[in-house]
Structures are given as structure tokens and as C-alpha cells.
Design a protein with these regions (language model features):
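N-terminal leader/targeting segments and the immediate start of mature chains
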Residues: 2-81, 236, 240-248
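Generic short beta-strand segments
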Residues: 56-63, 90-92, 184-190
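Short, surface-exposed coil-to-beta transition loops
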Residues: 68-74, 95-101, 193-199, 219-223
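N-terminal beta-strand/beta-hairpin edge segment
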Residues: 70-115
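Short, solvent-exposed aromatic-acidic interface loops
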Residues: 89-97, 215-221, 242-247
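Acidic/charged, solvent-exposed loop-and-adjacent secondary-structure segments enriched in E/D, K/R, S/T
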Residues: 110-155
């Protein structure tokens, strides 16, 4: 059973951020869509310059999965230099909530797999909890760390100036606990990486920070929520008593 769970975990973790798609709450309000290109350029630049960030991707896929489980959400955060990172993917099915968790801290990769019963609480909630496993993290953080994740997202989105000739409708909404403006593009716009198209984005009304991007790709829609730019708490290693002791 453990071997099967490990294989499933590895398969799920292989989800590419290039498949990020789009869907978000549509709230009404008043705003002008005339400055969508300027709002996009400012927001994109802020994300490019952030030294840490949290990205939560909610996926809604209508495309064939070819036997691969598609998570309902993927939550990753950390500094863009790749020195550490936190990853949690969540799957909900048949009354169960499955979490695939990873942390990279001080050259060590910690991972575990948990299952909970939805709607239960207390001792009835956990269905399966494994200890964290610890292995040396030998991958190049520039290729697999948070910076690479941000670069992958940016590469799938229009570059600065990419919306200059695009019409958009704008709505004043509440998003992430603050006043915001959601721009809905009249036509989806692709970035340098073909196959992914931006359909809408939301920025903070106060400082123009990018709050969400909505994209579509090959039958997959999702919303990526960005937060904690430059303010991500340091990633901590799990408590020692929750880590599986290695033989020898």
C-alpha cells in the first residue's frame, strides 16, 4: 500500500504549472477598463521583482486526465532564490481530502502524504497520516525552486505591453479581503509559451499588486491567487518527532 501511495504521490507532484487555467468569483462593481494594459504592466513588474511569493492555483479541468489525478488546488510558497519552498496539493474525492505535502529546508526535502475524512472532526477526521520522510535535496534550486515556478507562470502570461491593443471590461470587487479591480479581456491573450491564454486578472485597488490571474489551456481552467509578495514566512522543517528516522 505504501508503495502505491508513493507512486501516486510522485505522479501527482508531476503536475506542470504550464497547465494552469482559470475561474474566479465574478462580483459586480464600477471601474474603467481603459487602463487594463497599464494595470497589467505594473502588476506584472511587481511580481517579477518580488523576492518571495505565495501562489495558490485552483484547477477546473474538463480535459481527459489519461488516468492522472488532477489536484483541486496547489499551494506553493517561498523565496524566489530557491533556498526553501513549501508545496501542498489537495485532492477531494469520495468524501476524502488527500494532501501531498513537501518542504525544502536547508538542503533537505521533507515529504508526506495524508488523507482526511471531509466533514469529520477531532479523532474521526484523520484517515491516514504518514510521517515526514527526509532526503537530501540535490536539485538545482534555480531550476526547481520558487523562482522557477514564478518564471513558469510569467512565461505563460502576456509580457509587459502584451495587452496594449486588447479591450477589457473592469469590475470593482472584493478580493483577498481588499478592494480590487478585475479586468476581463474581450479575447484570451497568450504569452510566449503557447497553449496557455490569459482571460482575466485582478489587481489591488490600493497599490496595483497582482492578486489573481485567470487562464485557460486545453480544457483546463483555474485561478492563480498571489499573495505575501516579499512577506512569505520562512519555511520551517517539520518537528523532529514527526520525521521518520532513517535506518543506520
Amino acid at each position: 500500500m505504501r508503495q502505491c501511495q508513493t507512486q501516486t504521490r510522485r505522479t501527482r507532484r508531476g503536475l506542470s504549472l504550464a497547465a494552469v487555467g482559470a475561474a474566479a468569483l465574478l462580483l459586480t462593481g464600477c471601474a474603467s477598463g481603459d487602463d487594463a494594459p497599464g494595470a497589467w504592466d505594473r502588476a506584472r513588474t511587481q511580481l517579477e521583482e518580488a523576492d518571495s511569493v505565495r501562489m495558490v492555483t485552483e484547477l477546473r479541468s474538463e480535459a481527459p486526465s489519461n488516468g492522472r489525478a488532477v489536484p483541486d488546488s496547489v499551494d506553493i510558497s517561498g523565496p524566489v532564490d530557491g533556498s526553501s519552498m513549501r508545496y501542498v496539493s489537495v485532492y477531494q474525492d469520495d468524501g476524502l481530502i488527500t494532501r501531498d505535502e513537501s518542504r525544502i529546508v536547508d538542503g533537505t526535502a521533507y515529504s508526506r502524504f495524508t488523507v482526511e475524512r471531509a466533514g469529520a472532526s477531532g479523532e474521526d477526521r484523520p484517515a491516514y497520516v504518514e510521517r515526514w520522510t527526509a532526503t537530501p535535496y540535490e536539485s538545482d534550486p534555480r531550476a526547481t525552486g520558487m523562482g522557477a515556478m514564478v518564471s513558469s507562470l510569467l512565461g505563460s502570461l502576456p509580457e509587459s505591453g502584451g495587452l496594449d491593443d486588447v479591450e477589457a471590461d473592469a469590475d470593482g470587487i472584493r478580493r483577498s479581503g481588499q478592494d480590487a479591480i478585475r479586468y476581463v479581456l474581450d479575447e484570451p491573450v497568450s504569452g510566449p509559451q503557447e497553449g496557455v491564454a490569459l482571460t482575466a486578472f485582478t489587481v489591488s485597488k490600493e497599490d496595483g499588486r497582482l492578486l489573481t490571474v485567470e487562464t485557460e489551456s486545453a480544457g483546463t481552467k483555474a485561478v492563480v491567487t498571489l499573495s505575501e509578495m516579499g512577506e512569505v514566512d520562512p519555511v520551517q522543517a517539520p518537528p523532529a518527532d514527526e520525521v521518520l528516522k532513517q535506518d543506520g
